[in-house]
């Protein structure tokens, strides 16, 4: 009986002005305990003007390096995927890095089920310049065909680029990524793939996601404290404006892809799945321009309505009560009161010895 052919993996690193991080990213791939003959490394440079090129040249023919004019992450990923030859394509941003065992873990997961379209996993994050690794809280991981899992679409969280790997034959059905997505372009892929193939989640920390000043997604952006930060930082305001636009464009792009491929976008869970980008975009916009009471009330009402199918009746009562309460206290006071409530809840749980 013949043995199965070893899986071949393309590691696709997209980068832009990450010269001070890129070597750590590449080295984290080269030091993986994975046969080199089963791996190719592609670096797509989206027009860096720092020393990225010089740093990458040191690696010689171990790296396939593609330099292009600046067009955003979607254009970089589209180019890289078109050049990929592996059966599996694993992503890595130039400012993040992998941990030992990453490649072998995802390759094994794909080999378990030939139908699996995407494998993703848990991760650490670190805030520069600190070396402390922390775990993101409140994120869910799923395995299976998401539309068949009760509330699967509503509870599905999108993970960072460096945690994602796709079967190339499935990935090609999701292309092209809309090139208006200059950042977080992989969200289009991980949002669409769940409708055409099962996914698999590995509950291991196999990647480090780096948070630094140039990172667009480095805070929540939907509380009064964020408003105060943005008011004194023009560069941060510019990044947040781009975040608002990009988040909306992701939702629009996913909706168009679903309609083009014959999916029912009016199915309640699909409609709620798409609505999350509008709600997230609105929340980020509020950090730029705090909303009036009526608009904030409408936002909270939409949150309650579209998340309602995954709530218990008690949660629904609380959410709707909060929405109507916002009419009396307004945006800033609502978040201050909510922060106080959560702090009190954490203190009580700590006193009772609960995690």
Residue locations for each model-derived region?
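A conserved hydrophobic helix/loop-capping motif in glycosyltransferases and polysaccharide synthases
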Residues: 9-21, 25, 32, 44
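Conserved nucleotide-sugar donor-binding catalytic segment
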Residues: 143-228
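Short aromatic/hydrophobic "clamp" motif used to bind/position activated sugar donors
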Residues: 89
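Glycine-rich, basic loop-to-helix element that forms the pyrophosphate-binding segment
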Residues: 68-84, 105, 148
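C-terminal subregions of glycosyltransferases and related glycan-biosynthesis enzymes
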Residues: 183, 208-355
């Amino acid at each position: 009986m013949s043995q199965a052919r070893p899986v071949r993996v393309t590691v696709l690193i997209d980068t832009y002005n990450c010269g001070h991080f890129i070597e750590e990213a590449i080295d984290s791939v080269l030091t993986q305990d994975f046969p080199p003959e089963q791996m190719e490394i592609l670096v797509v440079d989206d027009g860096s003007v720092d020393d990225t090129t010089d740093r990458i040249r040191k690696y010689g023919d171990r790296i396939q390096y593609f330099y292009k004019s600046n067009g955003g992450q979607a254009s970089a990923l589209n180019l890289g995927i078109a050049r990929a030859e592996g059966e599996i394509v694993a992503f890595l941003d130039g400012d993040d890095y992998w941990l030992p065992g990453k490649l072998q873990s995802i390759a094994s997961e794909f080999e378990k089920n030939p139908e699996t379209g995407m494998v993703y996993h848990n991760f650490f994050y670190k805030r520069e310049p600190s070396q402390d690794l922390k775990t993101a809280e409140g994120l869910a991981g799923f395995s299976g065909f998401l539309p068949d899992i009760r509330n699967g679409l509503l509870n599905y969280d999108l993970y960072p680029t460096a945690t994602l790997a796709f079967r190339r034959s499935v990935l090609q059905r999701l292309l092209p990524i809309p090139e208006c997505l200059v950042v977080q372009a992989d969200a289009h892929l991980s949002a669409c793939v769940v409708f055409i193939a099962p996914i698999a989640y590995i509950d291991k920390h196999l990647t480090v996601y780096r948070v630094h000043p140039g990172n667009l997604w480095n805070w929540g952006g939907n509380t009064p404290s964020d408003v105060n930060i943005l008011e004194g930082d023009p560069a941060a305001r510019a990044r947040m404006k781009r975040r608002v636009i990009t988040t909306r464009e992701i939702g629009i792009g996913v909706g168009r892809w679903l309609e083009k491929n014959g999916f029912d976008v009016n199915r309640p869970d699909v409609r709620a799945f798409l609505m999350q980008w509008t709600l997230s975009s609105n929340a980020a916009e509020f950090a730029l321009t705090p909303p009036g009471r009526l608009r904030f009330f409408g936002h909270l009402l939409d949150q309650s309505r579209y998340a309602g199918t995954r709530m218990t009746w008690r949660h629904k009562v609380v959410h709707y009560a909060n929405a109507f309460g916002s009419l009396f206290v307004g945006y800033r006071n609502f978040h201050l009161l909510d922060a106080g409530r959560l702090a009190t809840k954490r203190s009580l749980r700590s006193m009772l010895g609960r995690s």
